[in-house]
Curated annotation (Swiss-Prot):
The keyword Cell division does not apply. Phosphorylated by ALPK1. GO terms for biological process: actin filament organization; actin filament-based movement; endocytosis; microvillus assembly; sensory perception of sound; vesicle localization. Residues 697-719, 720-742, 743-772 form the IQ domain. Involved in directing the movement of organelles along actin filaments. ATP binds at residues 101-108. The keyword Repeat applies. Changing residue 306 to M: Found in a patient with hearing loss; uncertain significance. Belongs to the TRAFAC class myosin-kinesin ATPase superfamily. Myosin family. One of its GO terms (molecular function) is microfilament motor activity. Residues 858-1042 form the TH1 domain. The lineage of its organism: Eukaryota, Metazoa, Chordata, Craniata, Vertebrata. This is Unconventional myosin-Ia. GO terms for cellular component: actin cytoskeleton; apical plasma membrane; basolateral plasma membrane; brush border; cortical actin cytoskeleton; cytoplasm; filamentous actin; lateral plasma membrane.
Amino acid sequence: MPLLEGSVGVEDLVLLEPLVEESLLKNLQLRYENKEIYTYIGNVVISVNPYQQLPIYGPEFIAKYQDYTFYELKPHIYALANVAYQSLRDRDRDQCILITGESGSGKTEASKLVMSYVAAVCGKGEQVNSVKEQLLQSNPVLEAFGNAKTIRNNNSSRFGKYMDIEFDFKGSPLGGVITNYLLEKSRLVKQLKGERNFHIFYQLLAGADEQLLKALKLERDTTGYAYLNHEVSRVDGMDDASSFRAVQSAMAVIGFSEEEIRQVLEVTSMVLKLGNVLVADEFQASGIPASGIRDGRGVREIGEMVGLNSEEVERALCSRTMETAKEKVVTALNVMQAQYARDALAKNIYSRLFDWIVNRINESIKVGIGEKKKVMGVLDIYGFEILEDNSFEQFVINYCNEKLQQVFIEMTLKEEQEEYKREGIPWTKVDYFDNGIICKLIEHNQRGILAMLDEECLRPGVVSDSTFLAKLNQLFSKHGHYESKVTQNAQRQYDHTMGLSCFRICHYAGKVTYNVTSFIDKNNDLLFRDLLQAMWKAQHPLLRSLFPEGNPKQASLKRPPTAGAQFKSSVAILMKNLYSKSPNYIRCIKPNEHQQRGQFSSDLVATQARYLGLLENVRVRRAGYAHRQGYGPFLERYRLLSRSTWPHWNGGDREGVEKVLGELSMSSGELAFGKTKIFIRSPKTLFYLEEQRRLRLQQLATLIQKIYRGWRCRTHYQLMRKSQILISSWFRGNMQKKCYGKIKASVLLIQAFVRGWKARKNYRKYFRSEAALTLADFIYKSMVQKFLLGLKNNLPSTNVLDKTWPAAPYKCLSTANQELQQLFYQWKCKRFRDQLSPKQVEILREKLCASELFKGKKASYPQSVPIPFCGDYIGLQGNPKLQKLKGGEEGPVLMAEAVKKVNRGNGKTSSRILLLTKGHVILTDTKKSQAKIVIGLDNVAGVSVTSLKDGLFSLHLSEMSSVGSKGDFLLVSEHVIELLTKMYRAVLDATQRQLTVTVTEKFSVRFKENSVAVKVVQGPAGGDNSKLRYKKKGSHCLEVTVQ
């Protein structure tokens, strides 16, 4: 094993030589200076706080420690977490991880590393990942509301936390339960120099946006709040703004709704604003001192935020109601009493809010009832504290640490040595300090310090901190671990550091002097009933739920338990919980008092090493056995290593264990057989057993696979053989059936042929020679008849647009079917034409002619299709003057409309009336009633028109005519399609020739002797024929723009 390869110093202190305090300290210092902060004592991890981030964490290291046993890699918290998790998962043993040490030694970070490792290595899946994320995200929420900067630690836990993480049989997390112990709520109203209040206040003021601050009626400046230490508002290495956003995100992940988060922040801001409520003296006629609120603004803002009348708040803060069974008396409070009531209310609100947050987290991460689970507990509790001024909080904190030290002693030092004695294992006793006498001094039910404090709080008459101290001096004057000024004077000892109001306890970690001032008040932890009832009357749902005892209907005159009694009871439950689990220890050490990286104070570390009992722990580990287990469980786990015990063993458990270890040829010095357990001295031997078991499991897995594969192949072969026989039988039967069918069909065919031949032979004289033709003709006619009758019943509609036709049922009738389809269509067309009047026929012929001339050629043609040709667009029939224009021309006027004539010289237009008759085209001025120009249709040579939507066209005349000698005409008509169609038909009727209609954008027009090129272009407006712009370009070119 590579435990000693490439190591700095000794990685496991069990191997340290010589085993003295000096060499132990030098080894820790050498490793610390080389950034090796973890060291083993057997399976105990010693962690020295580096005060910096080291590159020894993350997924890469988690994967590495997951694949190796405890001693195969460098010492690490991950290794201990892996051992605990595997013992829980594989050996079905509940585990607990105890993290102890002074304040600032790195306990909180160690607990985070344990939780992150367990979360990384346990199961996967959407639900499992959700549970893991909720467990991990509980840390930033609890740290924000329960941690603060102290003189010794920038992120000191000011409460105790024990988390039970619950797993299923596969080792996947199901949820958890968090238990909190004694929040240091006195910090809320007063902090020592260089310390801060709880983190959440600074995070809220730094990280909340302006809208949230306005809603909470807060200002960002921390100097505006009496409860915040103005000297230290920022901490190096902490970003309060980003931490606040992280807390909000973590609360959402855990399951807090947006409304719950808002209510928590409102109660938090209310506590902060309570500190700014100033109390002043008020005059009463009776002369009794009274008090009142100096500035009502703060009280009004609090009332508006939580839905409470400001007068109700002021009355509750400045007066007190004394109630007995018969009467109720209201007394005014003086300024000191009102300030005490204000601070007591703030502390109670915050403490109850913290408890509510813990319970709310537990609701989200709790496991369903009835589920079988395994448990891993992680204890992160405040460290041992020795301050300049130690009060009630330090007393109960150090009492808790005494109990944890007692757990370590009894489960590691005392229990281990007593177990050797019970099991009959030879053992040399190792002396150690048993702190049970100190625990008894504090917690004894009748004569302990806590019992005396409760008795003094409940005693009638004048009670004070000094009477409590006098009682302690009387009871413990001869106790070896108790000192005070009175006991020192009695022994004629003089200590100027001991005050008159102080007592001293010699703890396992050193002597601590406690100032009894406020011990009685802090232990009573009383809140006046007026304040309870006022908070219950609030309309704020969360605040109201924090004070259920404020409900007058549930009012009780019973005195609530004291803070000391509650804490003692909680510690007792915690100890019972820890004793029920297999312990794993992380002993945290603080290398210096200044939280500086790289500094190692030998005196400070030596003090911690002594009271943690590291040397005694090493001696016990060196003299003892690394692993012990009952014969039954040991045999159950390792019996597969022996052919004698595997797969069945009918003898006793101890004999079976001896058989297993005997076949493995284990050294007798490595083993000891107790009365009920087997003891293994070194971890190396245990690892060897585990390795042999792993190899054997692989062999058994291979054997199982081999047997399973053989069984599967045999089963598959038998199934295939059975299937083959079945298929063969069915195939042979089917082949015989087919063969029989063919033979039968052949026989029937031969029989039919023979019978036919015999019949034809016998009846040939009765047959006519043309019978076959007659039958064929009959069959063909039947087919034709059937086809024609079917066609008759399925004829398409008589609509000329319907061209559907049934298909021929026989190929021989396809030609006839096509002829019938053509005849039917022609008949439908004739029938349609016969129904038309002559006028309708003429209209359709004109439309047909227009289609042949302009369809697909002229852009304006589609618009003219649905519009009937009118012919008369100037009201010719109703105007006798206009009728005279046709002169002596006989017959009707085919077209009459107003057109525009383009001037040959300048390109300007002038209005004209155009009449089209069967023989002439007549142009006249609109102001005159006589024809100006008469053009015979035989003189019209052709017409040119553009493909655009304009109405421009050129009327080309024969040069030989008298009218044509002056040149062609360039005209513009709004009905150019109709005009040219009628002109085309009139020319055809008059001259028996087709009029040439040219569609083009470029054409030549003859003006007298000159030829002018006309070019028509599309303008940007896009083809509206109502506007044409003419522009002459030289004497032989005219450009027309269609706008």
